[in-house]
Design a protein with these regions (language model features):
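Single conserved hydrophobic/aromatic residue that forms the stacking wall/gate
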Residues: 1-6, 11, 245-254
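Short capping/connector residues at structural and topological boundaries
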Residues: 60, 66, 84, 91, ...
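Acidic, low-complexity central loop/insert segments
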Residues: 138-242, 246, 251
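A residue-level structural signature of the nucleotidyltransferase/glycosyltransferase Rossmann-like core
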Residues: 2, 93, 187-188
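Acidic, proline/glycine-enriched N-terminal capping motif
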Residues: 8, 12-127, 132-134
Length: 254
């Protein structure tokens, strides 16, 4: 009987709203945003932002009455004809250390990592057990037992977990440590025929000449008196275009 199992006092006239369950986890509070180290500078430049995973990243910078298409066309032409700068800080950066680091990476990447020399870079494809591509990016050999992996911007955490699963559950005999340094380094990509010229105008103790710093090579040094990592890589394959990744400690970059 109803009187034995409950009370009509508990029956509401209307159902509970979904908002009551969600509480403050809605709108801007639903998911915390990650902002770039140079976020205030992008705002000052009039950037229109887009959601890229958890990151707020500039999509384009309109001038005057430009719409999105016009702004993107102007920016693309500037990179083709001269130079452009992209804040690429969300790019995933995982560091792999240990005496078995090279063997470990050779197992998880489709590419041959055994032949990658110190100071060299190589584009890599990461596959799952079914042979399906789950991520890609440039692999840098910092030392014989130290590698820097670049993942897709939204995949750093997922790939980090993927690597840890293999190390902790399958290949427990390998001596390898994986750390996520994505938010520790601000990354800028300088692109276009004048990229090298612009970079050479800044105080830098790295030889940036074409002969000393070739395609798919990596260097460490100081830029504007700050430690930096510089990588030469091309995303188009055009010889006339030089792509340079400038990576600096986040706090110093700000």
């Amino acid at each position: 009987e109803l009187g034995l199992v409950g009370s009509e006092m508990c029956i509401r006239d209307s159902p509970t709203t979904i908002g009551a369950f969600a509480g403050i986890e809605q709108g801007d509070l639903y998911q915390p945003y990650q902002r770039l180290p140079a976020h205030p500078a992008h705002v000052a430049a009039g950037a229109v932002f887009e959601d890229f995973g958890a990151w707020k990243r500039p999509a384009y910078y309109p001038q005057g009455s430009e719409d999105e298409e016009a702004a993107l066309a102007r920016e693309a032409k500037a990179v083709r004809d001269s130079v452009g700068l992209l804040d690429y800080s969300p790019l995933g950066k995982l560091e792999v250390h240990g005496p078995d680091a090279r063997e470990f990476l050779n197992r998880v990447y489709l590419n041959n990592i055994q032949t990658l020399k110190v100071g060299g870079c190589r584009y890599g494809l990461m596959l799952n057990e079914a042979g399906i591509v789950i991520d890609d990016g440039v692999i840098v050999c910092l030392a014989e037992d130290h590698f820097l992996l670049h993942t897709t911007s939204g995949g750093a955490t997922t790939i980090h977990q993927h690597l840890e699963e293999w190390l902790q559950c399958e290949w427990v005999d390998l001596e390898v440590i994986v750390s996520n340094s994505t938010t520790q380094w601000a990354t800028m990509m300088l692109s276009g025929p004048q990229a090298r010229t612009v970079l050479q105008k800044l105080p830098c103790d790295i030889d940036l000449s074409r002969e000393a710093f070739r395609h798919m090579q990596y260097r460490e040094g100081n830029l504007c008196s700050q430690p930096c990592r510089i990588l030469r890589a091309s995303f188009t394959g055009e010889v006339s275009v030089s792509y340079t990744h400038l990576t600096l400690p986040t706090r110093r970059f700000v």
